[in-house]
C-alpha cells in the first residue's frame, strides 16, 4: 500500500497576512453535566488568530477539547481548563480563547396555593474568555414574569369610582349592596392591562460556582409575579392578587432586579434588561440597568 501524506492546508501561509479577532465554530451540539443532570447544549468555541501570516486555526483541536465538558460537572474551573487547552493547542497562533454554552434549565415550580406543580424552562448562556491569564465568566438567563401597568390600574379604579357614583347617587348605601355591586360585571367596569414580560440578566461571576437556580429564585422573588405552570382557580386568584400588589412599569422592574442582584456576593457586576410586551401598544417597553463593584 502506498503511504500518502495528507495535506494540511491550514498550516500554509496566508496570501493576505492579517490577524483575526475570532475564528472558531458555532452551534456545536453536545451534552453537559449540570446540577446533577445531563443537558443538551450548544457550544460556540473559538480563538483569536494573532499570527496573521497563518492561513487558519485547527478547529478539530477545539472540538476535541470540548470532550472534557461531557465527563465532568460544569464549573468555571472546568471551563477555564478547556480554554487553556484551546490556547495550548494553538500555541504561537492565538492569544485569547472564548467559549459560549447555551442550554435550557428546567425547574419544577409549585403552584401558588394548590398542591399542583409543573416545569418551566429558562434559557441560559455561559460566556467565558481567557486572555493574558485573565479569565472571565458571565452567566445569562431569561426569566418570564407578569407585569400590570400602574397607570392603567389607576385609570381602571377611577372608572369604577365613577360607575359607583352613577349607580348609587341618591341611594342609601349598605354594606351588602356594595359588596354585591363589587362582585358584579356592572360594578367592575374596567380592568388594568397586563402583559407577559421578560427579564434578561447578564451577570459576571466571582468564584467557582454557576448558581443558575439561585439567580432565578432571587430575581423571581424580587419581581413577585413569576409566570405559573399548572394552576387551579385558587392559584389564578392568588396570581391576580400578586399582580395587583406588584404593579410595575418596566423602570420599576429594572430597579427591583438591580437592588436584588447587587446583594449577591458572587456577583462582580451585571446588566439587567427588562422587556414588557405591551398589550396596549404594538411595541415593547424596555429598561436597562447596570452595576459594577
Swiss-Prot record:
InterPro entries listed in its UniProt record: GTP_cyclohydrolase_FolE2 (IPR022838), GTP_cyclohydrolase_FolE2/MptA (IPR003801)
Pathway, per record: Cofactor biosynthesis; 7,8-dihydroneopterin triphosphate biosynthesis; 7,8-dihydroneopterin triphosphate from GTP: step 1/1
Site positions (May be catalytically important): 149
One Gene Ontology molecular-function label: GTP cyclohydrolase I activity
Annotated GO biological process: tetrahydrofolate biosynthetic process
Catalytic activity: GTP + H2O = 7,8-dihydroneopterin 3'-triphosphate + formate + H(+)
EC code(s) of this entry: 3.5.4.16
Keyword line: Hydrolase
Stated role: Converts GTP to 7,8-dihydroneopterin triphosphate.
Family classification: Belongs to the GTP cyclohydrolase IV family.
Protein name: GTP cyclohydrolase FolE2
Amino acid at each position: 500500500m502506498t503511504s500518502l501524506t495528507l495535506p494540511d492546508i491550514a498550516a500554509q501561509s496566508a496570501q493576505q497576512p492579517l490577524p483575526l479577532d475570532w475564528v472558531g465554530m458555532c452551534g456545536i451540539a453536545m451534552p453537559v453535566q449540570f446540577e446533577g443532570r445531563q443537558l443538551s447544549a450548544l457550544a460556540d468555541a473559538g480563538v483569536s488568530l494573532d499570527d496573521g501570516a497563518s492561513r487558519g486555526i485547527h478547529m478539530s483541536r477545539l472540538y476535541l477539547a470540548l470532550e472534557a465538558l461531557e465527563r465532568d460537572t460544569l464549573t468555571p474551573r472546568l471551563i477555564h481548563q478547556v480554554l487553556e487547552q484551546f490556547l495550548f493547542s494553538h500555541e504561537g497562533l492565538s492569544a485569547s480563547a472564548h467559549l459560549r454554552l447555551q442550554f435550557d434549565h428546567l425547574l419544577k415550580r409549585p403552584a401558588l396555593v394548590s398542591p399542583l406543580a409543573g416545569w418551566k424552562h429558562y434559557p441560559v448562556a455561559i460566556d467565558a474568555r481567557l486572555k493574558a491569564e485573565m479569565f472571565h465568566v458571565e452567566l445569562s438567563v431569561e426569566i418570564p414574569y407578569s407585569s400590570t401597568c400602574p397607570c392603567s390600574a389607576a385609570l381602571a379604579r377611577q372608572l369604577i369610582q365613577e360607575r359607583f357614583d352613577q349607580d348609587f347617587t341618591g341611594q342609601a348605601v349598605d354594606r351588602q349592596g356594595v359588596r354585591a355591586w363589587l362582585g358584579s360585571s356592572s360594578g367592575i367596569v374596567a380592568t388594568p392591562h397586563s402583559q407577559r414580560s421578560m427579564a434578561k440578566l447578564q451577570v459576571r461571576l466571582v468564584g467557582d460556582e454557576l448558581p443558575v437556580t439561585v439567580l432565578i429564585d432571587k430575581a423571581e422573588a424580587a419581581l413577585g409575579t413569576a409566570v405559573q405552570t399548572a394552576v387551579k382557580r385558587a392559584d389564578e386568584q392568588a396570581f391576580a392578587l400578586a399582580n395587583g400588589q406588584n404593579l410595575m412599569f418596566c423602570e420599576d422592574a429594572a430597579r427591583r432586579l438591580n437592588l436584588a442582584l447587587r446583594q449577591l456576593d458572587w456577583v462582580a457586576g451585571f446588566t439587567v434588561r427588562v422587556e414588557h410586551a405591551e398589550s396596549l401598544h404594538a411595541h415593547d417597553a424596555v429598561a436597562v440597568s447596570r452595576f459594577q463593584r
